[in-house]
Amino acid sequence: MSANILDGKAIAANIRRNIKKRVQERITAGLRPPGLAVILLGSDPASQVYVRNKRRACEEVGFKSLAYDLPADTTQANLLALIDQLNADSTVDGILVQLPLGGHIDAEQVIEQIRPDKDVDGFHPYNIGRLTLRLPLLRPCTPHGVITLLRTTGQDLRGLEAVVVGASNIVGRPMMLELLLAGCTVTICHRWTRDLHKPISEADIVVAAVGKPHLIQGKWIKPGATVIDVGFTRQPDGTLTGDVEFESARQRALWITPVPGGVGPMTIATLLQNTLYATEKLHE
């Protein structure tokens, strides 16, 4: 058996087309386009690539894209003041601060400074709390993008056994909440988990989000399972490698995401969805 490929790039392109159409309809009706402000601190090459991709996606669908590229030595006070300025700007529907930040910046305070209704990354404690209470508003982009991918398989997710490998605040923990909301029975694994292969071998859905190349062996995958590889590591030759042994896992899984081209495009597509939602449902 060779798994079906979950083509996040193609699915995300369709989402972006629908968003672009909706933005054009808004402009035709005399309404303003959604506005997204993206803040980049410093010149980390990986962060610059991520931010460039997000800004390009915004412009392609017709959003108003605001770029704030700040020097690495920007103070906490100045960064918070900029966020306050954007919070008060009625033409800005979403504020995104590219993580990670410098060691002198308190990232949690920065996230909490963003108005919850403009937190299109879905990281604010208010938005995580609503997701916990099964009242989602603006949802974390990567986890919700994964749910969108899973829905495209046509499976009924209710009652399925799901394993999340990785317990970060960005992906692992909100991923657990999204899967619970979808009706899955969820196990979350982390650095202290013993015998990692055991829960994985029983899982109908495996979401890997660690950033450790080939952590998950293909032979661990339950036949017919769905494998979502969120993690990626850039190798010395420039190629990207996921957390899962792709080729061997592909021989056992029913569905699997590639790296790259799987989850990454869905994260950006969900960011655009969140920004449009904030515009139409929270700011009008």
Curated annotation (Swiss-Prot):
PROSITE patterns: THF_DHG_CYH_2. It catalyses: (6R)-5,10-methylene-5,6,7,8-tetrahydrofolate + NADP(+) = (6R)-5,10-methenyltetrahydrofolate + NADPH; (6R)-5,10-methenyltetrahydrofolate + H2O = (6R)-10-formyltetrahydrofolate + H(+). CDD domains: NAD_bind_m-THF_DH_Cyclohyd (cd01080). InterPro entries: Aminoacid_DH-like_N_sf, NAD(P)-bd_dom_sf, THF_DH/CycHdrlase, THF_DH/CycHdrlase_cat_dom, THF_DH/CycHdrlase_CS, THF_DH/CycHdrlase_NAD-bd_dom. One of its GO terms (biological process) is purine nucleotide biosynthetic process. Its EC number is 1.5.1.5, 3.5.4.9. GO terms for cellular component: cytosol. Pathway: One-carbon metabolism; tetrahydrofolate interconversion. NADP(+) binds at G166, A167, S168. GO terms for molecular function: methenyltetrahydrofolate cyclohydrolase activity; methylenetetrahydrofolate dehydrogenase (NADP+) activity. Disulfide bonds: none annotated. Catalyzes the oxidation of 5,10-methylenetetrahydrofolate to 5,10-methenyltetrahydrofolate and then the hydrolysis of 5,10-methenyltetrahydrofolate to 10-formyltetrahydrofolate. Homodimer. Belongs to the tetrahydrofolate dehydrogenase/cyclohydrolase family. This is Bifunctional protein FolD.
